[in-house]
Amino acid sequence: MTKIVLLLALSIGLAIQPSEKRYPRNADEFDELFHKISNWGRWGKDDQLGAANLVTAEKRKQAAALVKSGVTVSLAHNPLTERAEDNANPFEHTMLRGFNMDRYSVAYHGYAHSHIDALCHFLYKDQTYNGYARADVNTEKGCTKLGIDTLKNGVVTRGVLVDIARLRGVEYLEPGTPIYVDDLEAWEKKSGVRLAPGDALLLRTGRWARRAKLGPWNVAQSAAGLHASVAPWIKERGVSFVGSDAGEDVTPSLVEGITLPVHTLLITALGINLLDNQDLEALGDTAARLNRWEFMITIAPVPVTGGTGFPLNAIAVF
């Protein structure tokens, strides 16, 4: 009898888990959520900065005050020059004869190279962040609005490492592992650091540790990452930038009919620039050694006019 009661209680408990954890599940629910959390018009109809507006002068001063030891950590993974399952477009470096000069060539979007996404990089139903029409933004010479050049003055703010692999006591999360609000809040409790307006959230899944141990795999098809249900929480916290050691989204997508729901919600609905493929291994080790999970971060992409992003070497300063 006791066994039956326990099984019944367990089944009831599973049945009454909040549905929000799995929401949105399909394209209709996704559309509902997109419009519910949208930041379009929040900073004016002509805004091109999005959530970067929350990085105020006061926020920069607060971030600078976090520098205690002067330790710096790069968040960039060295450019991958060999074709692999996660690197369809290897970085090319050519020396020019006669001089110590070189030429670089890279198609950085994807799952190999550390880079930042501009707000014009993603669209939803033919509109970018703030409701600009595709036809008015996308041209052969680049984006007329929301290009990476909007961040020409750079970003200095508080960075917060959210290390879900360490939270779970593993070297890395297995590909396809979804990360929910419960996980983010459990990390806040463990680390003692609560996300706040203007912050850059950096999510470590251990992707690069797994790659170093087991070799490359198709990250586009299978990667640990955020579930789309975290988007309202990210807006509530006021996060300005989100980065991870893969592409932020859990893959494959858990929202039927939507390929990259987190990219779409964060970039297009909320106006949040994403930092893809950051190497957070050294950052995780340094933060653990210092027992400090917050730091100053600098983000300074080359301001290509109308660019959809740029390779990035973000720096954390403790």
Model-flagged regions — what are they?
Residues 8-17:
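Hydrophobic h-region of N-terminal signal peptides that target proteins for export
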Residues 1-7:
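Sec-dependent signal peptide recognition
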Residues 17-318:
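Active-/binding-site microenvironments in catalytic and ligand-binding cores
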